[in-house]
A protein has these predicted regions:
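Positions in alpha-helical segments
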Residues: 5, 30-33, 45-48
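Short amphipathic helical patch at the helix-1/turn junction of helix-turn-helix
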Residues: 1, 12-13, 41
Length: 97
């Protein structure tokens, strides 16, 4: 959970409470806690808002968020080589888009 760990780290470094960031996102604190723990995925627009509020590069935050989505898609696959091969194929397809 790259994104959740990053927002928790930044929040703690900046001395912010979960409820403060939850209010900024207009969600309740338990929902924010789930996002931070990786139990729930933030929406793309929430990632952008968090990047702004935490004074972080939006592209970096979106990259972590999207990487988590990829990891979630393959985490139950037992054959890691198959996962790596699928990522390479997807990467090549993305380049051609």
């Amino acid at each position: 959970m790259l994104f959740g760990d990053k927002i928790k780290e930044l929040r703690e470094e900046q001395g912010l409470l979960q409820r403060q960031l939850a209010a900024f996102l207009e969600i309740d604190t338990p929902m924010f806690s789930k996002i931070e723990r990786g139990d729930r995925r933030a929406k793309r627009e929430q990632v952008s808002k968090l990047a702004e509020d935490l004074h972080q590069d939006e592209k970096e935050m979106l990259t972590l968020w999207l990487a988590d989505k990829f990891i979630d898609a393959v985490e139950d696959e037992q054959e890691r080589d198959l996962c790596n091969d699928a990522i390479i194929v997807a990467q090549e397809k993305i380049k051609s888009l």
